């Protein structure tokens, strides 16, 4: 299990989308926006937006809508993006290297401090000035560098064992890209990300119409 939340996960998962939308509005010099206009941009009902934001105090003004900069700044604080977090990556393969090279995370306050792998041929490799190290050194590194978040990009066979080591070393949050749902203590924050899920959703939607045509054409046989 992962750490319990006060606000529902459905609401929490919409917050980054609101934040991203507001960031684009600011870039386009839009100062205020109504919940109706925001809903059209987001594909979420205006009522849902108001309900979501009311979990944190509301922020809107009747007849005015939302002050874009004020709401953006409030969501930045709510999402904890006004703080910085020390992160490590476990697994320096293609996915691990891609995440390490994604500079947007650093701009959002997620500072990459170390990369670890089991492959000796990768030891010493530098990705954006961060050196790949032996995973056997990870516990000591966590203790000495106050690491907040571990990003797991390794095969599923070693994922749970590695997660157990990370938790024991004091990691309080794991972003898991390994193709397995990890189990962690209740006080550890866990996000399991299965990249194939989104692709499978697309494949379903591509075949949905054909599927239901077949279902409508089938007859139900009753024994007896």
Curated annotation (Swiss-Prot):
Residues where NAD(+) binds: 91-96
Subcellular location(s) per record: Cytoplasm
GO molecular function, one term: DNA-binding transcription factor activity
InterPro entries (alphabetical): CoA-bd (IPR003781), NAD(P)-bd_dom_sf (IPR036291), Rex_DNA-bd_C_dom (IPR009718), Tscrpt_rep_Rex (IPR022876), WH-like_DNA-bd_sf (IPR036388), WH_DNA-bd_sf (IPR036390)
Main localization (coarse): cytoplasm
Disulfide bonds: none
DNA-binding region as annotated in the record: 17-56
Transmembrane helix listed as a keyword: no
GO biological process: negative regulation of DNA-templated transcription; response to redox state
HAMAP family the UniProt entry points to: Rex
PANTHER family reported in the protein's UniProt record: REDOX-SENSING TRANSCRIPTIONAL REPRESSOR REX (PTHR35786), REDOX-SENSING TRANSCRIPTIONAL REPRESSOR REX 1 (PTHR35786:SF1)
Biological function: Modulates transcription in response to changes in cellular NADH/NAD(+) redox state.
Family (UniProt): Belongs to the transcriptional regulatory Rex family.
Protein name, per record: Redox-sensing transcriptional repressor Rex
Native species: Caldanaerobacter subterraneus subsp. tengcongensis (strain DSM 15242 / JCM 11007 / NBRC 100824 / MB4) (Thermoanaerobacter tengcongensis)
């Amino acid at each position: 299990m992962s750490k319990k939340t006060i606000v529902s996960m459905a609401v929490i998962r919409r917050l980054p989308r609101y934040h991203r939308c507001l960031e684009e509005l600011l870039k386009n010099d839009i100062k205020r926006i109504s919940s109706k206009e925001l809903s059209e941009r987001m594909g979420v009902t205006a009522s849902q937006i108001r309900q979501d934001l009311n979990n944190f105090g509301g922020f809107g003004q009747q007849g005015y809508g939302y002050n874009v900069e004020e709401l953006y700044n409030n969501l930045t604080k709510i999402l904890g993006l006004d703080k910085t977090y020390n992160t490590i990556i476990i697994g320096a393969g293609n996915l691990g290297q891609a995440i390490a090279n994604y500079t947007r995370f650093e701009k959002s306050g997620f500072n990459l401090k170390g990369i670890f792998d089991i492959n000796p041929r990768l030891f010493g490799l530098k990705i954006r000035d961060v050196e790949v190290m032996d995973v056997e050194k990870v516990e000591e590194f966590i203790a000495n560098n106050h690491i907040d978040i571990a990003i797991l990009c390794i095969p599923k066979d070693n994922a749970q064992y590695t997660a157990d080591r990370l938790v024991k070393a004091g990691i309080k949050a794991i972003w898991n890209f390994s193709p397995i749902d990890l189990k962690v203590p209740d006080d550890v924050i866990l996000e399991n990300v299965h990249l194939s899920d989104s692709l499978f959703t697309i494949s379903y939607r591509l075949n949905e119409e054909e599927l239901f045509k077949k279902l409508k054409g089938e007859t139900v046989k009753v024994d007896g």
